[in-house]
Amino acid sequence: MDPATNSPIMPIDLPIMHDSDRYDFVKDIGSGNFGVARLMTDRVTKELVAVKYIERGEKIDENVQREIINHRSLRHPNIVRFKEVILTPSHLAIVMEYAAGGELYERICNAGRFSEDEARFFFQQLISGVSYCHAMQICHRDLKLENTLLDGSPAPRLKICDFGYSKSSVLHSQPKSTVGTPAYIAPEILLRQEYDGKLADVWSCGVTLYVMLVGAYPFEDPQEPRDYRKTIQRILSVTYSIPEDLHLSPECRHLISRIFVADPATRITIPEITSDKWFLKNLPGDLMDENRMGSQFQEPEQPMQSLDTIMQIISEATIPTVRNRCLDDFMADNLDLDDDMDDFDSESEIDVDSSGEIVYAL
């Protein structure tokens, strides 16, 4: 698996919060389609936090609202902690826990692949976080290495992040849209069937486990890894293999085979994974009591931001500033954006952009 080429963080005119505000700027730490992320310091607690800036206006869509509302409801050690949203003159800012260890993806790229014990250590934490999400009736729908962060401890704690594609069965209907990243997407999603988001998350967890163990994606053609059509075909036919020279225990191979099952009705479930023999081996004590896991997060000095306040801020953020409207007009008049996937089958039901993201809800 080749490391993704990280684009340089372009300077952007974002407001540094004023002296009267709660956070002080430290440095820029990331950028993407959403905007930019900054490392900030909480003036009161001195804690480092990550602040994700999204430009006010049309970028504040239902995905942003869903991300914030779902993320706010989750309080678990294996999920990046949501703190609050703030409205600046030009951006909506989402304040959350800072994971100093970076992406799990980067750790695998540096290591090549993990030992079976190390992969299990992170997989146990991933399943713990996903199990909690499902207990809260939230399906992530975009689980991948880039959406799993690590804290800075010697034995890193895994943190699930980015709930932009998440769906709540309490607040939303049964998932019917095609979202996520092709390498991680379950067959039933690609077939545009109404699907169980929890079982689709299981498949994505299986892809994450495979990559940790093998150092490559299970359904990519090694000769043409960027051929997304071929990746999709291999997912639909569940065509994958484990290198012959890779020494994995029979129990590990068996678990992978129970995850990569095309029919979601016969695929292993999260509760079944948590009782699997391979999963339970060397299970850390703090992961054994799921009820205790959800209560480890206590911040009495910082009450949770109310839902009414959040919805009001999001509503105001949908109104673009004058500066942003002018910039949008300029960009529309001067840029001719090419679609890198023009050669993708025009009759295909799936739309994929150049980053490999499934971009249209079908």
From Swiss-Prot:
<feature type="binding site">
    <location>
        <begin position="29"/>
        <end position="37"/>
    </location>
    <ligand>
        <name>ATP</name>
    </ligand>
</feature>
<dbReference type="GO" id="GO:0106310">
    <property type="term" value="F:protein serine kinase activity"/>
</dbReference>
<dbReference type="InterPro" id="IPR011009">
    <property type="entry name" value="Kinase-like_dom_sf"/>
</dbReference>
<keyword id="KW-0547">Nucleotide-binding</keyword>
<feature type="binding site">
    <location>
        <position position="52"/>
    </location>
    <ligand>
        <name>ATP</name>
    </ligand>
</feature>
<dbReference type="GO" id="GO:0004674">
    <property type="term" value="F:protein serine/threonine kinase activity"/>
</dbReference>
<keyword id="KW-0938">Abscisic acid signaling pathway</keyword>
<dbReference type="InterPro" id="IPR000719">
    <property type="entry name" value="Prot_kinase_dom"/>
</dbReference>
<dbReference type="GO" id="GO:0009738">
    <property type="term" value="P:abscisic acid-activated signaling pathway"/>
</dbReference>
<comment type="similarity">
    <text>Belongs to the protein kinase superfamily. Ser/Thr protein kinase family.</text>
</comment>
<comment type="subunit">
    <text>Interacts with ABI1. Interacts with FREE1 (via C-terminus).</text>
</comment>
<keyword id="KW-0808">Transferase</keyword>
<dbReference type="InterPro" id="IPR017441">
    <property type="entry name" value="Protein_kinase_ATP_BS"/>
</dbReference>
<feature type="active site" description="Proton acceptor">
    <location>
        <position position="142"/>
    </location>
</feature>
<keyword id="KW-0067">ATP-binding</keyword>
<feature type="domain" description="Protein kinase">
    <location>
        <begin position="23"/>
        <end position="279"/>
    </location>
</feature>
<comment type="function">
    <text>Together with SRK2I, key component and activator of the abscisic acid (ABA) signaling pathway that regulates numerous ABA responses, such as seed germination, Pro accumulation, root growth inhibition, dormancy and seedling growth, and, to a lesser extent, stomatal closure. In response to ABA, phosphorylates the ESCRT-I complex component FREE1, which is required for ABA-induced FREE1 nuclear import.</text>
</comment>
<keyword id="KW-0723">Serine/threonine-protein kinase</keyword>
<keyword id="KW-0418">Kinase</keyword>
<dbReference type="InterPro" id="IPR008271">
    <property type="entry name" value="Ser/Thr_kinase_AS"/>
</dbReference>
<protein>
    <recommendedName>
        <fullName>Serine/threonine-protein kinase SRK2D</fullName>
        <ecNumber>2.7.11.1</ecNumber>
    </recommendedName>
</protein>
<dbReference type="Pfam" id="PF00069">
    <property type="entry name" value="Pkinase"/>
</dbReference>
<dbReference type="GO" id="GO:0006970">
    <property type="term" value="P:response to osmotic stress"/>
</dbReference>
<dbReference type="GO" id="GO:0005524">
    <property type="term" value="F:ATP binding"/>
</dbReference>
